[in-house]
Swiss-Prot record:
Protein name per UniProt: Phosphopentomutase
InterPro entries reported for this sequence: Alkaline_phosphatase_core_sf, DeoB, Metalloenzyme, Phosphopentomutase_DeoB_cap_sf
Keyword DNA-binding attributed: no
GO molecular function, one term: manganese ion binding
Originating organism: Helicobacter pylori (strain J99 / ATCC 700824)
Superkingdom of origin organism: Bacteria
Subcellular location(s) of the protein: Cytoplasm
One term under GO cellular component: cytosol
Length: 413
């Protein structure tokens, strides 16, 4: 029997502070719940949307009920008895961090049980010897930034100086990351990528999870804008991924859409598709759902929920993007094949109503749809790896070292 798996990951779409949220300073965070509350109270109205949060297709997969189980309250405006077609769970993270890589790796069987390296100082964030080595090896004459910053704010603040000097902008955040912003045309994309590759080699011994190239365009602070040519340089996963097992045991196709390939350092990926906007990510995903061969795993990361709305603390923008995604989700559902398993999940939270600009430690929704799957609550998962283990079960692969299977199909005992 030819099967496919389609994973739609809404980057940062948490559904309530997890039991260890206090350890991360995230008590009270609830990405979905607080967006729904703002919408319900007309605090997220804009030219693009208004009123309660309307996500009928996600509700049908069990989103509201999953959030109810996770946070002990139904998101405002959601139905207690939706027309349920999906099976739903919620999951806590086993990994020691609340970043993109930890969440993604864990769900494919490689939880991060070690500590990443971090740059904790808000200013003068990077050790001088590291900066000196980067300058020496890449022949750059100087740099700007060297601090914690929002990526969109720092190009506003330092972009004009960057154009004068052509010094790259170095910055970080609460995540294990070293980010380099530079003008795509004046500094050059290839130059930026080469700089990031060199920085990645230098930083790898410090267990810095990612170096990210952040190209931008524009002529002044009023029109600087990041482009779609972001590139992530990630440490390779420390354990075998579900992808690799699928390729070895079933000769499967693993199709990355968006930044998935970069997150897994291109390990176990057989096809890659880039996309710039949320609309493009939806378009490419739908195209693959229609055309990808059987025996495929299609995996899309919808990054804009995190980068454009979560970190920027834009509640209305997040709500509008969710409603757009929900409408496009109907197209995906309508084009699934007989033996497709659809999974909808997240990798961490990033509550746009919360203090600061960082990720939030939250439970994630785990929503499944297959024509032979009984709509039901599947319980609380103690690790995101339950997602990968369920996929391994569905595809008939050797089990992962972490996680348990959540799926029980009609006709099974």
């Amino acid at each position: 029997m030819q099967k496919r798996v389609v994973i739609l990951l809404l980057d940062s779409f948490g559904i309530g502070a997890s039991e260890d949220a206090k350890d991360f300073g995230d008590l009270g965070a609830n990405t979905l719940g607080n967006i729904a509350k703002a919408c319900f109270n007309n605090l997220a109205d804009s030219n693009d949307r208004n009123g309660v949060l309307k996500l009928p297709n996600l509700e049908g997969l069990g989103l509201g009920l999953s959030a109810l189980k996770a946070a002990n309250e139904l998101p405002l405006g959601f139905q207690l008895k939706p027309n349920l077609i999906g099976a739903y769970a919620y999951a806590k993270e086993l990994s020691s961090a609340k970043d993109t890589i930890s969440g993604h790796w864990e769900m494919m069987g490689a939880p991060v049980l070690f500590e990443w390296g971090y740059f904790k100082d808000k200013n003068d964030s990077f050790p001088k010897e590291i900066l000196d080595e980067i300058m020496h090896k890449t022949k750059i004459k100087g740099y700007l930034g060297n601090c914690h910053a929002s990526g969109t704010e720092i190009i506003k603040d330092l972009g004009e100086k960057h154009l004068e000097t052509l010094y790259p902008i170095f910055y970080t955040s609460a995540d294990s990351v070293f980010q380099i912003a530079a003008h795509e045309e004046r500094f050059g994309l290839d130059h930026l990528y080469a700089l990031c590759e060199e920085a990645f080699q230098i930083l790898e011994p410090l267990k810095i999870a990612r170096v990210i190239a952040r190209p931008f365009i524009g002529t002044n602070r009023e029109n600087f804008k990041r482009t779609a040519n972001r590139k992530d340089y990630a440490i390779k996963p420390h354990k075998k991924l579900l992808f690799e097992t699928f390729i070895e045991e079933k000769q499967g196709e693993v199709i990355s859409i968006g930044k998935i390939a970069d997150i897994y350092a291109h390990v176990g990926i057989t096809q890659k598709f880039k996309a710039g906007s949320l609309m493009e990510l939806c378009d490419v995903t739908l195209d693959q759902v229609k055309n990808a061969p059987n025996n495929s795993l299609i995996f899309t990361n919808f990054v804009h929920f995190d980068s454009d709305y979560g970190h920027r603390r834009d509640v209305s923008g997040y709500a509008n993007a969710l409603e757009y995604f929900d409408a496009r989700l109907k197209e995906v559902l309508d084009n699934l094949r007989e033996n497709d398993l659809l999974i909808l999940c997240a990798d961490h939270g990033c509550d746009p109503s919360f203090k600061g600009t960082d990720h939030t430690r939250e439970y994630i929704p785990v929503l499944f749809y297959h024509k032979d799957l009984q709509p039901a609550f599947l319980g609380k998962s103690e690790t995101f790896a339950d997602i990968g283990q369920s996929i391994a079960y569905f595809l008939g692969l050797s089990p992962l070292d972490y996680g348990k299977n959540l799926l029980n199909f009609k006709g099974q005992p």
